[in-house]
Amino acid sequence: MKKILTMLLMGVTLTTSAQTAREDINANPFLAGSNYVDYDRQLPNFIYTKAPKGYVPFYFTHYGRHGSRWLIGKDDYNRVIRPLQKARRYGKLTQEGERVLGLLEEFNKTTDKRLGDLTTVGERQHHGIGKRIAQHFPEIFLSKNVAIDARSTVVNRCILSMVAECEELMAANPTARIHNDVSEALQYYLNKDWEGKVKESSRHEDRRRIGEFNDRNTHPERLMKVLFNDQQWAADSIHRHTLMRQLFEVAINMQSHDNSPIDLINLFTPEERYDQWRINNVGWYVRYGNSPMTDNNMPFSQYNLLTNIIQTADTCVALGKTQATMRFGHEVCVMPLACLMELGNCNVSVENLDELDKYWQNYKIFPMGCNIQLIFYKPAKGQGDILVKALLNEREMTLPVKATDTPYYYKWADLRKYWTEKLEKFNK
């Protein structure tokens, strides 16, 4: 009964979120990009709740995703270009189709040996994040000889993102002692492959049901008229639903680049952009969120990462010294970690895929450069409870335990107990 009541209350409080998602994307079409969203296109106001009187920050721990990048797949660009080139050979492109193909062919030249690489936009995102971290928590990052341990997965774009943030931290405090580490030995918690119950649950994804959802929300007819002058030829010769989705992926990721044909996003109407976002929202939720379809187990893919965060915090809190731990990886870790930690509404469980957009919006969790920060506070004088505050993409988040009298500040002992028991229960 309690669970049902919770979901009913959730419906009351979160129904406006569906309207907000549509309004968000109409106002800022780039949010339809899901994991391709440029971090700097949805910055918060950076107004934070002051710590309880007498408390000061002393430890910072974090996991962050790399910044904006080129698309990864070897065929991600060419699979869009090929059908348009085929249409050009048969004289089936409209004038707009010719323009779009020309833009894509020209841009494709820049992708040579660049697939998956960090872009200048991505580098800039991390310079901004690093600079703000130092500004927001000077008690930690401007303290003399502060120790900063920064680790990255072995992927170049993650390493360069780490470098960009650390450059800003060093610029803010030349006395900082920064240790950088990159190794396969760290992958077991920075970016671990699925295994055990998580891997088994991933196999429960109902591809037929998701495919039907995707088809219901893909309406290529208008776009095909924009690109092709012969609709019968297009229907017979082009996989129209597939082309629409793949062209959208290329167009929406143009925000990851400086001097790119970013206006390609205008090929899609507001309704089409929203539909394509809903498709991706569902896909990410089922594979990485707290989805009933995958047994509500996918967030536990970050079991090792949360364990590392807890254990490292134990050591640093016991030492009591001013220091920081930074980790750099991927959205496939940030997304389930945010769910596992139960930051804000990230861990909501929704059965009806058609209703998901009302309760859960992926662009709020994992844009390019997304990050989770935990800041620990202790009494400036004397003894007292250690407090912790969570930020998701530099926004204050609620946590799944009772807060102190000051919103967004929680007793670390309570939070640690909750997370530890949750992990232990899963591991039984």
Model-inferred region functions:
Residues 1-21:
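Bacterial Sec-dependent N-terminal signal peptides
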Residues 19-149, 153-325, 329-428:
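Signature for phosphate-centric chemistry
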